[in-house]
């Protein structure tokens, strides 16, 4: 798929999401999985907490993914030709794990001024309902942001275990993906996911795109990757591109970038659980 057709643009505007956009073949997604798991093997286990966020600075293949036209063409349809990637986050649920993501709206704690931020959630492995795929509640991206509370639940993958208070989930829509597909949703949309009850890891990565006129309202310094077009605003420092995995220049920049993200996400929190 290149640019989004009018019916999907209308759905995104009205409902706040689009499901199952093809990015690459399952075979190509498997190659990405193999690269990720080969890196995990070199360090003796799963990604460390600080490696989960903004890892496009660590892995060349993830930098290539956020620049992939099959990702960016649909994004351009939604926010225009000038696109910055604010960050990426890995969402890995081990087979049979209790990990889940409670219902939440990302605009409550990302500190971004724009309501036009788009999350592209890319499936590195199959994300079925059994495996704990993401679900959304249509139309919650418009109007007043819903009340959230911090629970610090040890199984909630969010930074402070946040959840929406007294949410009616009767209209929830599941968005299963095969490996190599992505879903799109406005970051103001209520979304969440259940535990992985399958016998395989559920591996995904979220990519967060914004127009360059967006501003960070929580910390003085923040960064992003200019992935298409131009940035005439200069609100975010531009990130370097890795020439190979664990490029020393980018690893050093990542330490600062991931630290800034933690400062944003944990702002006002009573506890810092160290999940990113």
Per-region residue spans from a language model:
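Non-heme Fe(II)-dependent double-stranded beta-helix
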Residues: 1-112, 149
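Short, conserved beta-strand element in jelly-roll/cupin
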Residues: 104, 111-129, 176, 184, ...
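Non-heme Fe(II)/2-oxoglutarate
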Residues: 42, 189-276
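Proline-centered turn/helix-capping motifs that create local helix->coil transitions or kinks
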Residues: 41, 79, 126-129, 141
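Feature marks short, surface-exposed loop/turn motifs that line or immediately flank catalytic pockets
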Residues: 27, 94, 128, 143, ...
